[in-house]
Amino acid sequence: MKIAFTGDILIYESQDKGCIDKNGKRDYRPIFEQVKPLLDGADYVIGSFETTAAGAEAGYTHAATSFNTPDELLPALKWAGVDLLTTANNHCFDRGEAGMRRTIDKIVENGLEYTGTRLSGKDSNYLIKDFDGTKVAFLAYTYGTNSRSNGYIIPKGKDYLVNLTRPQDEPLHRPLWKRVASKLLSIVSKPKAGSGIQEDCVNAMEVANGRNELYEAKMLDTIREAKQEADIVIMCLHSGGQFNSKVGAYTQHLFDIISEGGADAIIGNHAHTTLPIYQQGNCFVASALGNFSFAPGEGYWVDGVEAEYSALLTLNIADKTIVGHKVDICKCVRNEMGLAITVPVNNEQEIEPINNRLK
């Protein structure tokens, strides 16, 4: 049994425009066409869906840090071989609660599964799949939801909407003119290469923050609950820095408590670069898989950190346990039409520095 995991899936404005034909119809399949054979080689594929499908009326992606992608991305991912999308990430409320709910609806409409966000408190906050008698539980959690910038705070009584490892950050209260100016600047300004490296998006002081303990306890209870129902528990964790070269203290803290809490594997994303894959006790850890789909040099971008590469991770499962893994290196490049697409990398010299990051 082979279960594969992609890095973060984002669609930038240039990619969207490059996928519109002369009749105004969108087709995102060219972005994934060259990596489709790799995805087809797995029995089940999980993608990190770091955008929303909130609809045209909510406004499509136009800034570097706020995402909403046309619905046509979902059938393209299904066509490429993706089966399950993790939806707990810092962009899940980029278009508010309505956008998050519509995203789930569209995922289901297109024959895909999801985990990480929920429509109702009655829904399970993890997904269990039975693969020929081996039950695997998939959980997805995020460190936050960009609430400081998008201003969305989960209403009281709706904490089921997304799986969080800590409380949401308080929104920044700025005068209206500053908010408008900031939004306009994000649209017209070009990214500054090298200006956005962060070791962790959560301060190291929060490792000992008592406010987080309730969230962590609920997460660990969920892991134990899933462990009662499944043979293998896989945590898809959205946490970390940005373009960082090592795992930050807060995210390492999460790795520690999740592995000690009984998860069999942790699949990390969010860093927008690749980070080490290793065994931590009885838990397999992939710290960060990188960018599976995005536009190099566009939006929030840093040079010199191999951000255009990602690791397509495949876990091999036999006898109801993880028995090994394989990594295929992928790269986001621009084709002859200027469209940023994802391709497999087969050149050993090019692969070597990425493999070094994964050690």
Positions of the model-derived regions?
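Acidic, metal/ion-coordinating pockets
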Residues: M1-K359
